[in-house]
UniProtKB/Swiss-Prot annotation:
GO MF annotation, one: GTP binding
Name of the molecule in the record: Elongation factor 4
Physiological role: Required for accurate and efficient protein synthesis under certain stress conditions. May act as a fidelity factor of the translation reaction, by catalyzing a one-codon backward translocation of tRNAs on improperly translocated ribosomes. Back-translocation proceeds from a post-translocation (POST) complex to a pre-translocation (PRE) complex, thus giving elongation factor G a second chance to translocate the tRNAs correctly. Binds to ribosomes in a GTP-dependent manner.
Organism classification: Bacteria, Bacillati, Bacillota, Bacilli, Bacillales
Species whose genome carries this gene: Halalkalibacterium halodurans (strain ATCC BAA-125 / DSM 18197 / FERM 7344 / JCM 9153 / C-125) (Bacillus halodurans)
Subcellular location(s) per record: Cell membrane
Length: 609
């Protein structure tokens, strides 16, 4: 193609993504757009076409990004090339959203006509505004009996400040309003700007591992062009590769001779390691490199850690292989081997958030068939020692002695909760109970409120989301972002069995809630650990101070059964002998904690306040 042809093609490209809260109908709308532009034949079409993973279809959520090229014949007679980039809506994957938005010029904002604006919708809209995208509001699900499109239209104007007078009223399920949406994309979303002749700049917004071709990078070309045989360089790592093939997704991958400005597609270059194609990194040409990378790249740091151990210790190597494979596709997963006296060999893994953690666990159990035990999730604490050194602690058993600690800081998040008026009291009570600091409250309209709190991440990790949903009958929506570290009065609590510390059950807790939590755990263990021949104390301690205790009573053998009548001194001799034996047993006895007891303690919910 010469320069004129390239520019003419570039003016007909529209790159857009779809932003929505979970369950507002994003994947269904994507399906309708694919149908309307006849990207797929009727035979190939299935629901949630862009959600490839079984897990995504079951939970009805989008986890990995997908990008599709579509051709649409508009009413003005021209054929336009659309690139639809599907984004996840969940808060754990907000970095994925921000990268996919950076690859677009416009975004469809989908709002449910019955539910109105939710917390995650807002969070993603702000990301889109940060990336200077043209936002087109779409009010979806107008076929519902409870739909109130006019109220929602007003809400979009009041809460977000977008002009919603031209918002399309649509029902993705019934295919209403789809054509209007496509026409609006043609009219309102700007074509990509960028010099097709300039040095290559391409944004990596996702990558996956293919066992035949190595790493496949999903890219958006911002400037220049790329074709097979070209030498490319990653700007974050400085590594160089030779391109083997480029192409686009129509949802199926199709090879192309070159990708130019505005194209969204894939590139392979016999890259062996997903770590080399960091998401958000810029690809440039090795011979004619760009001066500076595209802005916005940052390394993702895990927020939540937990230990993963195979139930059957022989599965350790399989678990390592499973994690290696998942890491190929998921750059934000981190893991390192660790051992626990109680659970044997396993891995300490870092995740972006709780949903991310659950999904990884489920994928290991499903795709690799390994049964797992997971330890309680913990966050990264910053510990300042008396000698001035600062340590980052993600595992409670690595916490230094109390005498050496100057202060402990823990990560706080800013939580935005949207909730109907009736539940404001319940939500505020929950947040206060989780050591939340009240920041702000706004009434969005006569029946919905936005409440903002600062809450320690460790409290959210535990079971905040479940409690929020149950306290508000499922009506609250919730979004959080990390704001930094604050000092807290935190202590490490150990659980002792027969005087021995069980390392897998150590937790870091706030001093005020240590007694409650300790008492709960020892009571639970008392129920679940089988009785021994000798009595076993179960204790919770902070340092050397025991704060809670319960005792598993001994099983007793009746040694007097063989004395029919007879002298008291004879009986006493037998009882003394038994007592000696029990004492010796207790000194050398070892108490095994059964698997179920671990699972029960780690899954233990806090008492409802």
């Amino acid at each position: 193609m010469n320069r004129e042809e390239r520019l003419a093609r570039q003016s007909r490209i529209r790159n857009f993504s779809i932003i929505a809260h979970i369950d507002h109908g994003k994947s269904t709308l994507a399906d309708r757009i694919l149908e309307k532009t006849s990207a797929l034949t009727q035979r190939e079409m299935k629901d949630q076409m862009l959600d490839a993973m079984d897990l995504e279809r079951e939970r009805g959520i989008t986890i990995k990004l997908n990008a599709v090229q579509l051709v649409y014949k508009a009413n003005d007679g021209n054929e336009y090339i659309f690139h639809l980039i599907d984004t996840p809506g969940h808060v754990d994957f907000s970095y994925e959203v921000s990268r996919s938005l950076a690859a677009c010029e416009g975004a469809l904002l989908i709002v449910d006509a019955a539910q109105g604006i939710e917390a995650q919708t807002l969070a993603n809209v702000y990301l889109a505004l940060d990336n200077d995208l043209e936002i087109l509001p779409v009010i979806n699900k107008i076929d519902l009996p409870s739909a109130e499109p006019e109220r929602v239209r007003q809400e979009v104007e009041d809460v977000i400040g977008l002009d919603a007078s031209e918002a399309v009223l649509a029902s993705a399920k019934n295919g209403i309003g789809i054509e209007e949406i496509l026409e609006q994309i043609v009219e309102k979303v700007p074509a990509p700007s960028g010099d097709p002749e300039g040095p290559l700049k391409a944004l990596i917004f996702d990558s996956l591992y293919d066992s035949y071709r190595g790493v496949v990078a999903y890219i958006r070309i911002v400037e220049g062009s790329v074709k097979p045989g070209q030498k490319i360089k990653m700007m974050a790592t400085g590594k160089e590769f030779e391109v083997t093939e480029v192409g686009v997704f129509t949802p199926k991958p199709e090879k192309r001779e070159e990708l130019t400005v505005g194209d969204v597609g894939f590139l392979t270059a016999s890259i062996k390691n997903v770590g080399d194609t960091r998401v958000g990194d810029t690809i440039t040409s090795a011979n004619n490199p760009a001066d500076e990378p595209l802005p916005g790249y940052r390394r993702m740091n895990p927020m939540v850690y937990c230990g993963l151990y195979p139930v059957d210790t022989n599965d350790y190597n399989d678990l390592r292989e499973a994690l290696e494979r998942l890491e190929l596709n998921d750059a934000s997963l981190q893991y390192e081997p660790e051992t626990s006296q109680a659970l044997g060999f396993g891995f300490r893994c870092g995740f972006l958030g709780l949903l991310h953690m659950e999904i990884i666990q489920e994928r290991i159990e499903r795709e690799f068939g390994i049964d797992l035990i997971t330890t309680a999730p913990s966050v990264v604490y910053s510990v300042q020692l008396t000698n001035g050194e600062v340590q980052q602690i993600d595992n409670p058993s690595n916490m230094p002695d109390r005498q050496k600690i100057e202060e402990v800081e823990e990560p706080y998040v800013k939580a935005t909760i949207m909730v109907p008026n009736d539940f404001v009291g319940a939500v505020m009570e929950l947040c206060q109970g989780k050591r939340g600091i009240f920041i702000d409250m706004q009434y969005l309209d006569e029946n919905r409120v936005q409440i903002i709190y600062e809450i320690p991440l460790s409290e959210i990790v535990y079971d905040f989301f479940d409690q929020l949903k149950s306290n508000t009958k499922g009506y609250a929506s919730f979004d959080y972002e990390l704001i930094g570290y604050k000092p807290s009065n935190l202590v490490k609590m150990d659980i002792l069995l027969n005087g021995e510390v069980v390392d897998a059950l150590s937790v870091i807790v706030h001093r005020d809630s240590a007694y409650e939590r300790g008492k709960q755990i020892v009571e639970k263990l008392k129920e679940l650990i089988p009785r021994q021949q000798f009595e076993v104390p179960v204790q919770a301690s902070i340092g050397t101070k025991i704060i809670a205790r319960s005792t598993i009573k001994a099983m007793r053998k009746n040694v007097l059964a063989k004395c029919y009548g007879g002298d008291i001194s004879r009986k006493r001799k037998l009882l003394e002998k038994q007592k000696e034996g029990k004492k010796r047993m207790k000194a050398v006895g070892n108490v095994e904690v059964p698997q179920e007891a671990f699972m029960a303690v780690l899954r233990m919910d806090e008492p409802k306040k």
